[in-house]
């Protein structure tokens, strides 16, 4: 119903937002001048903005919709007759999830995680806005490419482009191999 549509929209939203908008929202949430960021910083000693953790958070938020959409599709493809049969045998919902649903959705989840990882390593906009581009601290491969191109070092930019292409291609090939083995 409406609640599910709301959560689905919220979990998918980072996929359609401009990355700089997502980065700005993260800045507002995690700033030490805001309640959540202040709590993390003062109560737990965790600083997120302009740190390597900020890079991870930004890339994860941007990539999450890919994982979520794949996992959701995998769970939706499960034959409900199998679930109904398990219920008629008296199997608890907890066991149905762990022993039937999760194993049946495993390939979709793995594909989603792999696609999300491939997307996360190429993230630029939200990471730049939220974590910055601090050399040796928060610089990502995508930021490094932009930096060396701006300085005219096309050879280094080419090297880093090849690295990202190789990692992304390896992710896609692994998804195809994993999904191909299941057929």
Show the residue positions of the predicted features.
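Glycine-rich helix-loop "coupling/hinge" segments at transmembrane-helix boundaries
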Residues: 27-28, 32, 126-152
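Glycine/proline-centered hinge or cleavage motifs at structural transition points of membrane proteins
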Residues: 89-90, 103
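Membrane-water interface segments at the C-terminal ends of transmembrane alpha-helices
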Residues: 1-76, 100-125, 148, 157-180
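Membrane-helix/interface signature in polytopic inner-membrane proteins
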Residues: 72-83, 93
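The alpha-helix within a helix-turn-helix
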Residues: 86
């Amino acid at each position: 119903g409406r609640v599910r549509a709301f959560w689905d929209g919220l979990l998918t939203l980072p996929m359609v937002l401009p990355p700089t908008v997502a980065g700005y929202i993260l800045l507002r949430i995690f700033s030490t001048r805001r309640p959540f960021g202040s709590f993390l910083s003062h109560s737990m000693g965790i600083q997120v903005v302009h740190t390597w953790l900020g890079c991870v958070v930004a890339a994860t938020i941007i990539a999450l919709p890919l994982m979520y959409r794949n996992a959701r599709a995998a769970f939706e493809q499960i034959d409900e007759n199998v679930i109904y049969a398990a219920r008629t045998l008296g199997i608890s919902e907890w066991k149905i999830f762990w022993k039937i649903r999760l194993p049946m959705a495993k390939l979709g989840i793995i594909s989603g995680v792999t696609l999300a990882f491939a997307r996360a390593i190429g993230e630029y906009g939200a990471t730049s806005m939220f974590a910055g581009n601090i050399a040796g601290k928060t610089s990502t491969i995508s930021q490094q490419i932009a930096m060396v191109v701006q300085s005219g070092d096309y050879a280094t930019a080419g090297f880093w482009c090849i690295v990202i292409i190789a990692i992304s291609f390896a992710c896609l090939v692994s998804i195809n191999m994993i999904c191909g083995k299941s057929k």
